[in-house]
C-alpha cells in the first residue's frame, strides 16, 4: 500500500507542469469538461491571472459563450518572502471538499467542473462580478443583508451533514481517514494559529512599536497559553465534522444577493467550532477595524451596528438551522443520539441544548484564537492593514486583541451571542 | 484504491480457512517463524484449544523445546446464542496493536511471532502457567502486589507514546487513518457500552427480577443519558492515543510477578480515559463482587482493602509515570506543548495539571459507563455471574450500579482518586 502510494505520488510528480496562458489554452482544448463550459470556439479566450502567484495560479477564462476558473496548486506557499514547501495534494482535498459541500449546500458553494490530480488543477465556476471578496466589502462598508442567513445555512448544512448526528460511524470514519492525509495543511494551521503567536517566532509581526508590549504580553500570559493548548489538542484530535478549515472573510465571495464559499484547501475532519469561530472572529476583527476606516463622509457607526447584528444573526440562525436539521433527521442513519434513548422531545431538547452550548463555547474559543493570530502572528488581515495611520491601526488592533483574550479566557461564561456582543462593545472605546 | 482494497479483501477471503488441529500442525510446519519457536521435532506437539469458540480459535501448542499460541479470528462473534457477522480484519488490528504496544512496553505485552492477514492468524507467545486471567484471580481473592505498578507502567507508556505529547501530528494522523478501518469493533463498543444499556434492547439482561427496576431506572435517567451522549461522542471523535480498546480484567494475565496485557482486537485511536476507565471500572466491579464471594474461611475484608489500594495506586502511579514521560520527552517530536511556549517549569506544571485533571474525569466517566453496561447490558462479568445466590448477586450489582451512576454524573467534582475510593466505600453497605 505504501509502495503503491509512493508510486502514485511519483507519477503525479511526473505528470505535473505549471501552466502558463499558452499551455492553459491547450489544456482546456484537450479537456472536454472545460471546453464545453466555454462553448464552441476556443480561439478567442480572454484569460486573466488573478492569483497572487504565491500559493496557486488562478486563471479566469472567458469566452463569448461561457466562463471557467482554473486553479492550480503550486508545490509551495510563499509567506513574507520565504517559500515553504507545501504539498500540491491540497488541491485534491480542496476539490473533494468543494464537491462534498456543494452536494450539501449548492446555493453557497461553487460547482467543480473538472479535477486533475496529477496537475493539482481544479476547473470550477467563475464567480462573476459584482461578487467581491467579503473582506473587501467589509472594508468598504458595504452591508450584505443576506450574509448571516446564507452563512448560517452553509455552516449548518456542511457541519451537520458531515457529523455523527447524520452519518453512521462507519461512513464518518471513512471520511476521517481520507482527510487525515491533508495533515500538512493542518500542521500549518497548528503553527500559525496555535503556536507562533504565543512564542518568539521568526515570522511573527505586529504594528510596531505600538503593539510590541501587547505582543509580549500574549507570549507571557500563562492563562492564555493553557487555554490555547486545550484548543490546539481539540483541533487535531477531535474529528467532529468535515470543516472548510479556513473560513475567514477572505474565503467568501458576496453580492447583496449571493454568498459563495471558496478555497477549502485546509479541509479536514475537526471541531465544528473552528469553522464557526473563524467566521465570527473575522467579523469581530472587521468590527474593530471600522474606526480606522471612518471619515467625514461616513463615521461607520451604522455599519458597526450592522456588523454586530450580522454576528448575532449568524450564530442565532446557525443554531436554529442546525437544530432544525437535527430534528428533521433524528430518525436517520446518525447513531450519536438514538431515538430509543433520547425518547422524548424534552430529553432530546436537553441533549441539543448541551451540545449547542458546548459548540458555542468552542466557537468562541477558536474565534478568539483566530483574532489573536491576525494581530500578533504571521498573517494579518487587510481590515487592519489597510489603515494607513499606524497609530490608529494599532489602537483598533489593541481593542480587538484585548477583546479576544478576554473571550478566550472567559468563553464558558457566555450564555448567548447577545452577551458576546455586549462584551465586544465594551472594548470599543479608546 | 477502493478497487485495490476490494481485490485484496477477496483474495483474503479466498486464502482463509479455519484451522483444526490437523491442519494447524501442517500450517506450523510450513511456517518457519512458528516452527522455529517449537524446536526441531514437530511430530509430537501437544495442542489444546482454549478459545471459547465463539470469537476466535485459540490453540496452545507445546513441544519439548518450546511453545506458541495460535489465535485465529472467525468471521463472526457469538453472543447469547445469535451470531453477529464481524470482520476478521480485527486480527490485523490486534496484531498491529500488540506489536506497537510491545515495542513501547515489552515487559507487559506478549511477543507476536507471526501474523497471516489472509488467515486472520496470529502466532504469539504462550503466556504460561501459573499466569491466569486477572479476573479469575480477583474472584479467587488473590493479591497481586505488582499489579498497580505494572498496569500503570503499561498504560503510561502505551498512551503517552502514541499521543501528540510524543509524536508529530503527521505521524499521529497516519496512525489515526490506519485504525479508522477497525470501525466495526468500535461500533460494537458503541452499541453495547454507550447505547443498549440506556434503551430497551434485545440482548440486555440483568439479575431479574431483583434488578428489573434498577435497569428500568437507567433507561429513564435523563441526566445519565446526557452524560453518556457526551462520552459516546468523545469515544468516536477524539483520537487522543492508540488504545487497547477493551482493557478489562479479562484482558490481563497475571502471576504475582508478571502482568501481560492481551487481546487488543478493539484497538483504535480514541480517548485515553477509555482504557484507564476500563481497568479501574473493572476493579471497582471486582470490589463490589467480593461480598458475594465471602465465606466463613475468608470474609474478603482484607482483600477488599487491597483492591481499593490497587485502584488508588494504579491511578496515582499512572499519573506519576505519565508526567515523568512527559517531562522526559518535552523537547522531543511532540508538538502539543512546545517548549518555547510552555517555557517555565511552573507553566508546564500547570498545563500538565489541567491535562491530567481532564484525563482523570474522562477515566471516571468511561470507567463508570463500563461498570453500568456490565450490570444491565448484554455482557456481564464473571465476578458477579459466579455468585450463585441471585439475591446476593443482585445486591452486589446494585451497589456497583448506584456507585457507577453517581460517578458518571458527578465525575467532575472528584479531585483525587482518594475521593473516589471514599465514594466507592460509601456505597458498600446493604
Swiss-Prot record, chains A, B:
Catalytic activity: 5-(methylsulfanyl)-D-ribose + ATP = 5-(methylsulfanyl)-alpha-D-ribose 1-phosphate + ADP + H(+)
Pathway(s) this gene product operates in, as recorded in its UniProt entry: Amino-acid biosynthesis; L-methionine biosynthesis via salvage pathway; S-methyl-5-thio-alpha-D-ribose 1-phosphate from S-methyl-5'-thioadenosine (hydrolase route): step 2/2
Keyword Amino-acid biosynthesis part of the UniProt annotation: yes
Coiled coil (residue ranges): none
Induction info: By sulfur starvation.
Binding site for ATP: 52-56, 71, 125-127, 263-265
Domain of life: Eukaryota
Protein keywords: Amino-acid biosynthesis, ATP-binding, Kinase, Methionine biosynthesis, Nucleotide-binding, Transferase
Residues reported to bind substrate: 56, 246, 373
Keyword check for Protease: no
EC number(s) reported in the record: 2.7.1.100
GO molecular function: ATP binding; S-methyl-5-thioribose kinase activity
Record-level GO BP terms: L-methionine salvage from methylthioadenosine
Pfam families registered for this protein in UniProt: APH
Recorded family membership: Belongs to the methylthioribose kinase family.
Biological role stated in the UniProt entry: Catalyzes the phosphorylation of methylthioribose into methylthioribose-1-phosphate.
Subunit annotation: Homodimer.
The name this protein goes by in its record: Methylthioribose kinase 1
Species whose genome carries this gene: Oryza sativa subsp. japonica (Rice)
Amino acid at each position: 500500500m505504501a509502495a503503491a502510494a509512493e508510486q502514485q505520488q511519483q507519477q503525479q510528480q511526473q505528470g505535473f507542469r505549471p501552466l502558463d496562458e499558452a499551455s492553459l489554452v491547450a489544456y482546456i482544448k484537450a479537456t472536454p469538461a472545460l471546453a464545453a463550459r466555454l462553448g464552441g470556439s476556443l480561439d478567442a479566450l480572454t484569460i486573466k491571472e488573478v492569483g497572487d502567484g504565491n500559493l496557486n495560479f488562478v486563471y479566469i477564462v472567458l469566452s463569448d459563450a461561457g466562463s471557467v476558473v482554473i486553479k492550480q496548486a503550486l508545490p509551495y506557499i510563499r509567506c513574507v518572502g520565504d517559500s515553504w514547501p507545501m504539498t500540491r495534494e491540497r488541491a485534491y482535498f480542496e476539490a473533494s471538499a468543494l464537491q462534498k459541500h456543494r452536494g450539501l449546500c449548492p446555493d453557497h458553494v461553487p460547482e467543480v467542473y473538472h479535477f486533475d490530480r496529477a496537475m493539482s488543477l481544479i476547473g470550477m465556476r467563475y464567480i462573476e462580478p459584482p461578487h467581491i471578496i467579503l473582506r473587501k466589502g467589509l472594508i468598504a462598508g458595504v452591508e450584505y443583508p443576506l450574509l448571516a442567513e446564507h452563512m448560517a445555512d452553509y455552516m449548518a448544512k456542511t457541519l451537520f451533514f458531515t457529523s455523527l448526528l447524520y452519518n453512521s460511524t462507519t461512513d464518518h470514519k471513512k471520511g476521517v481517514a481520507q482527510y487525515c492525509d491533508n495533515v500538512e495543511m493542518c500542521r500549518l494551521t497548528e503553527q500559525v494559529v496555535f503556536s507562533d503567536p504565543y512564542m518568539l517566532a521568526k515570522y511573527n509581526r505586529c504594528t510596531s512599536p505600538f503593539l510590541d508590549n501587547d505582543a509580549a504580553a500574549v507570549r507571557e500570559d500563562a492563562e492564555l497559553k493553557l487555554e490555547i493548548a486545550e484548543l490546539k489538542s481539540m483541533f487535531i484530535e477531535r474529528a467532529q465534522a468535515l470543516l472548510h478549515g479556513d473560513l475567514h472573510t477572505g474565503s467568501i465571495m458576496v453580492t447583496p444577493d449571493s454568498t459563495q464559499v471558496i478555497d477549502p484547501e485546509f479541509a479536514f475532519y475537526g471541531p465544528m467550532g473552528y469553522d464557526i469561530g473563524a467566521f465570527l472572529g473575522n467579523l469581530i476583527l472587521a468590527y474593530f477595524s471600522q474606526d480606522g476606516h471612518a471619515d467625514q463622509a461616513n463615521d461607520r457607526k451604522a455599519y458597526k451596528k450592522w456588523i454586530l447584528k450580522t454576528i448575532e444573526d449568524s450564530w442565532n440562525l446557525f443554531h436554529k438551522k442546525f437544530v432544525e436539521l437535527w430534528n428533521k433527521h433524528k430518525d436517520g442513519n446518525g447513531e450519536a443520539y438514538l431515538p430509543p434513548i433520547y425518547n422524548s422531545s424534552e430529553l432530546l431538547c436537553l441533549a441539543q441544548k448541551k451540545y449547542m452550548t458546548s459548540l458555542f463555547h468552542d466557537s468562541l474559543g477558536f474565534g478568539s484564537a483566530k483574532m489573536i493570530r491576525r494581530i500578533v502572528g504571521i498573517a494579518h488581515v487587510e481590515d487592519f492593514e489597510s489603515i494607513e495611520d499606524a497609530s490608529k491601526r494599532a489602537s483598533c488592533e489593541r481593542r480587538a486583541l484585548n477583546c479576544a483574550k478576554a473571550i478566550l479566557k472567559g468563553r464558558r461564561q457566555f450564555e448567548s451571542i447577545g452577551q458576546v456582543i455586549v462584551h465586544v462593545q465594551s472594548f470599543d472605546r479608546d
